[in-house]
């Protein structure tokens, strides 16, 4: 039986690197993979997944209204060979129904799905996609990174253009190292309490 996997972490833990490495392992053996990324996440260019260490690959951009089960079912029957695995980067941006659609890809199409994403936002709240994945994924995998103090980083702080901590704002604001810093819970709390 195929499974739905969710590998989660805070920012800068290497989630995209792990995704690209796992996809490469399939491709190196001549297996077909499908990589997905949210259409509005164009930091590496439209329809591209990139890691901070320089690895990158093309991906299919998805929108909130897209039926991912239908997409994978069509691609699997397009004559280009069976899909061996589906990879989703920035999985926190999935909608709850899209997570269920990916579960059906694993359950009904027999294709494993590996989703990688953030668990929580800059306010310590779950993203809807992450919440659904934490609830229904067959396997959960924590990807670890460290705070400046050496402890495990589990939280992220969002910074404004002047480097000041933001406590309010939209949950989704795509950015990289210049906008987000990962901390352990204690140091996240310290930063969020700064005057």
Curated annotation (Swiss-Prot):
It comes from the Bacteria. One of its GO terms (molecular function) is zinc ion binding. It catalyses: thymidine + ATP = dTMP + ADP + H(+). GO terms for biological process: DNA biosynthetic process; thymidine metabolic process. Pfam families: TK (PF00265). InterPro entries: P-loop_NTPase, Thymidine_kinase, Thymidine_kinase_CS. It is found in: Cytoplasm. ATP binds at residues 9-16, 89-92. Zn(2+) binds at residues 147, 149, 184, 187. Keywords: ATP-binding, Cytoplasm, DNA synthesis, Kinase, Metal-binding, Nucleotide-binding, Transferase, Zinc. Gene3D superfamilies: 3.30.60.20, P-loop containing nucleotide triphosphate hydrolases. Its EC number is 2.7.1.21. The active site is at residue 90. GO terms for cellular component: cytosol. Belongs to the thymidine kinase family. Homotetramer. This is Thymidine kinase. It comes from Rhizobium meliloti (strain 1021) (Ensifer meliloti).
